[in-house]
Amino acid sequence: MLTVETRQAVNPDYAKTLDTEGLRRHFLANDMFRSGEIRLIYTHYDRFVMGGAVPNGAPLTLDKVEETKTPSFLDRREMGIVNIGETGTVSAGDETYTLNRGDVLYLGAGSRAVTFDGAGRFYITSCPAHRSLPAKLVSLADSKEVKLGATETSNKRTINQFIHPLVMESCQLVLGYTMLEDGSVWNTIPSHIHDRRMEAYLYFGMDEKSRVLHLMGEPQETRHLFISNEEGAISPPWSIHSGAGIGSYTFIWAMAGDNVDYTDMDFIQPGDLK
């Protein structure tokens, strides 16, 4: 079963007038992981798609998606898949890939139908691609590791870069995930924006009762979302994206836009936030 929800782009002047329900309706990515289903959110920010596939032992195939108006979803798109569950498989073209928990699979444009199987919980990201590039399976051990933060500032963390120029080639998609060390709660501090790219977060590995306070909005007009396990946030190019957790968590970040330069960001110091 395939379900697709469309999210329109929101400008910052309108966003700052929204109440809690309105903010969650536009920017919270939830209800993406249902057993036996593929559920996608099609955003108008760089035509980025995020979603989940939970085969639960019965294969699920993603092929034609009406919103793209192409014969197959990946005809003019690339895809990044992260397995946040148990071991599963992804088949595309004539190849089948085994993904353990934490593995990332990149599929280039023209990969045709994609089939998910096994016990995996697959997080899907996708954006338009101008050329076809080879598929690549990247394990945590093969990712580029970057240490940031400090215990004193409660933001000591490891950034693992997977779909990234230092690891592999993609067209527009950049993806990785960040793991916080014990005792640290803050991610992406100092905050930043990048007007050249949108970004999406997925928070996972959280206790049922735990929440992440996700900060968003223009630096002078910040807002917040309380986010549960396996929920995410859609971050427009004009918005900061930071958060603090009540308990441990990991988050997947994915970006699409004008470039794939991870360092292309404009930092906002805490004293400049309102």
From Swiss-Prot:
Co-factor binding details: Binds 1 zinc ion per subunit.
SUPFAM superfamilies xrefs: RmlC-like cupins
Catalysed conversion reaction: 5-dehydro-4-deoxy-D-glucuronate = 3-deoxy-D-glycero-2,5-hexodiulosonate
Enzyme type, top EC level: isomerase
A GO MF label: 4-deoxy-L-threo-5-hexosulose-uronate ketol-isomerase activity
EC id: 5.3.1.17
Family (UniProt): Belongs to the KduI family.
Designated name of the protein: 4-deoxy-L-threo-5-hexosulose-uronate ketol-isomerase
Organism this protein belongs to: Agrobacterium fabrum (strain C58 / ATCC 33970) (Agrobacterium tumefaciens (strain C58))
